[in-house]
Regions:
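ATP-dependent adenylate-forming carboxylate-activation enzymes
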Residues: 1-17, 209-214
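Short hydrophobic/charged patches on amphipathic alpha-helices used for structural packing
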Residues: 11, 64-67, 168, 215
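Gly/Ser/Thr-rich phosphate-binding loop
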Residues: 20-23, 33-121, 134, 224-225
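Residue-level signal for inorganic ion chemistry
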Residues: 22, 82, 135, 189, ...
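Conserved ATP-binding/catalytic segment of the ANL
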Residues: 129, 143-144, 148-203
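C-terminal boundary motif of the adenylate-forming
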Residues: 138, 182, 220-244, 269
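Adenylate-forming
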Residues: 156, 190-219, 246-256, 272-278
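Conserved C-terminal "lid"/linker of ANL adenylate-forming enzymes
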Residues: 226, 234, 265-304
């Protein structure tokens, strides 16, 4: 690619290459879905038809075919990883029968820890531990109470090169690699990530708040392109970079954008526990800085 990876540029490239398997970060699939799928199914009549047994299945198949075609049309499955996949987007992919799966890993594990074939994908999970890899949730109740995800096996590194201190904080004496991620695991071994332990926030009364879960909901709200949830004192604030294409199309002013964000805040709060509700949404004037895998560099914004 010689241009910025916009949905249009990506779809053109994939149409040319026609890959047999895709491994992508969530940002890519979310952009393509919002560009190629959502505009076609937002109509109230279409939503109603999609709920009807026979007609609905036909529409879903057509939507799935369109999305498959937009991604080259030649792949066995799309493997998504590197960050959390938006729950609403995933539920849509699952509902239309799209061939996707979500994996989880780390560089220290070369890099895969969990994976499921698309035929066994469970919505919200990142699969089960791969062959030769043990996995454990460090929690008294791994099904219901999030704990740190630990793993050991042939994929796990021996240690960090010439850094015994870092190795000692990550690998324990029993060979378990401490991922720093928090999650739960169901009876079948499917892992559900809640967020990073270092990202977890504490409410005024000691409640655990996972900002990623709030961000997942906020990212589905009107005009939201990218978002972060941060703590300012004891208050939670949503940082939002708005969708510039929509702003231009609708001819929105700054006051219009502020009003939409306040409406978003009022709409999202009833779906959150009282201790996790947003007190404000701040509009950012430029995109968030990101890592090479397109995750937002959270540490740059949490201390402002």
């Amino acid at each position: 690619l010689t241009k910025v990876a916009s949905p249009t540029v990506l779809m053109r490239a994939l149409a040319d290459v026609k890959p047999c398997i895709l491994i992508v970060v969530p940002l890519i699939i979310e952009k393509v879905v919002r560009k190629a799928v959502l505009p076609k199914i937002q109509d109230v009549r279409v939503k109603m038809l999609m709920k009807m047994p026979v007609i609905g299945q036909s529409i879903k198949q057509r939507v799935c075919d369109k999305l498959t075609e937009a991604l080259g049309g030649n792949f066995y499955e799309v493997i998504i990883g590197g960050a959390a996949l938006n729950r609403e987007i995933e539920e849509l992919l699952h509902d239309i029968g799209f061939r996707y799966t979500v994996g989880y890993g780390a560089t220290e594990c070369a890099p895969i820890i969990t994976y499921n074939d698309y035929t066994r994908q469970v919505v919200g999970s990142c699969g089960r531990n791969v062959i030769h890899q043990e996995l454990m949730i460090d929690s008294p109740d791994p099904v219901n109470i999030p704990g740190e995800i630990l793993t050991r096996g042939l994929n796990v590194m021996l240690g960090y090169y010439k850094n015994e201190e870092a190795t000692a904080t990550t690998l324990d004496k029993d060979g378990w690699y401490h991922t720093g991620d928090l999650g739960t695991m169901d009876a079948e071994g499917n892992v559900f990530i809640k967020g990073r332990s270092k990202n977890m926030l504490l409410g005024a009364n000691g409640q655990n708040i996972y900002p990623e879960e709030i961000e997942d909901k906020l990212s589905n709200m009107s005009l939201v392109s990218e978002c972060l949830v941060v703590q300012r004192g004891q208050k939670l604030v949503g940082l939002v970079y708005p969708d510039q294409e929509q702003i231009a199309t609708l001819g929105l002013s700054e006051s219009d954008i502020e009003a939409i964000m306040e409406r978003n805040r009022q709409d999202i709060n009833p779906s959150l526990p009282a201790y996790a509700q947003l007190t404000a949404i701040k509009v950012m004037d430029k995109e968030f800085e990101k890592t090479p895998k397109k995750s937002i560099k959270r540490f740059l914004y949490i201390k402002e």
